[in-house]
Regions:
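Conserved N-terminal beta1-alpha1 strand-loop-helix module at the mouth
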Residues: 1-85, 170, 181-182, 206-227
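Short amphipathic alpha-helical patches
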Residues: 58, 65, 104-105, 125-126, ...
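Short acidic, S/G/P-rich loop/turn micro-motifs used as interaction or catalytic elements
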Residues: 25, 152, 203
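Residues at the N-termini of beta-strands
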Residues: 41-42, 88, 144, 194
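Hydrophobic secondary-structure block in the mid-to-C-terminal portion of proteins
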Residues: 159-225
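A general structural signal for short secondary-structure boundary/capping elements
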Residues: 65-68, 90-93, 113-119, 195-196, ...
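Conserved anion-binding
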Residues: 73-77, 84-184, 200
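Well-formed, non-transmembrane alpha-helical positions, independent of function
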Residues: 34, 57, 80, 101, ...
Length: 227
């Protein structure tokens, strides 16, 4: 099982993905050490150069760590993140050059938005050289898309995710944007395949006990609604 298949399996099992915009590399290692034992996947976002060194620091200490690179908006940045050893790449939109780099390296690519879901799936199949209908079977970790935003101040877009699963059977839809512990229970009614919870789980990175407490609260909500 390659890294992308492994992180995809982890997300499917536990659903929760925590997002960290690190101020230093120690935060990346610390966040991983808190979240990993709980089964929560860590996404380190590329909003500064620290992200790259932070990913490297985690993987230097924990070579088998499954880390996602977030806010990857160029092919060059995707190459860099993959060189550092990430298991998957996440973008805020469908960016063809990012997707192309990911498929070339057989790394999970999770574009996001409220459209383009079909375009990115078709392009993935073309790049892998397989029939569209076989993409889900051969590369299940590429049969994904991120619903962004899932919630705004005035609307929710869960119905779009349900509609996508009509033509794209078994599509794995990960929700992000506007999610909180307060509305998580309602969100779970639409059965998301993964939940990017923003900085909610990492904002207390300087207080490990508090961070773990918040993470466990989110997990308890998920388990209570799905079991």
């Amino acid at each position: 099982m390659n890294k992308s298949a492994a992180v995809f399996k982890q997300i499917k099992e536990n659903r929760l993905i925590a997002i960290l915009a690190p101020k230093n590399t120690a935060e990346c290692v610390g966040a991983y050490e808190i979240l990993h034992p709980l089964g929560i996947t860590l996404e380190i976002v590329f909003r500064s150069e620290i992200a790259s060194s932070g990913i490297k620091a985690v993987l230097d200490k924990y070579p088998d760590a499954l880390i996602l690179a977030g806010t990857v908006m160029t092919g060059k940045l995707a190459e860099h993140a993959i060189e550092e050893g990430v298991a998957g790449v996440v973008s805020a939109d469908y960016i063809p050059e990012v997707l192309e780099v990911c498929v070339f390296h057989d790394i999970m690519c999770v574009p996001g938005g409220l459209s383009d879901v079909g375009k990115q799936l078709v392009r993935k199949a073309e790049l892998y050289g397989c029939e569209f209908e076989k993409l889900k079977e051969k590369y299940p970790y590429q049969w994904v898309y991120k619903l962004f935003p899932a919630v705004t101040a005035t609307n929710s877009f869960f119905g779009i995710a349900k509609a996508w699963k009509g033509p794209y059977k078994g599509l794995n839809v990960f929700y992000t944007g506007g999610l909180s512990a307060e509305n998580l229970g309602d969100i779970l009614k639409s059965d998301p395949d993964g939940i990017f919870c923003g900085s909610a789980l990492t904002k207390d990175i300087d207080n490990p006990e508090k961070m773990e407490e918040v993470a466990e609260k989110w997990l308890s909500i998920i388990y209570s609604k799905t079991n």
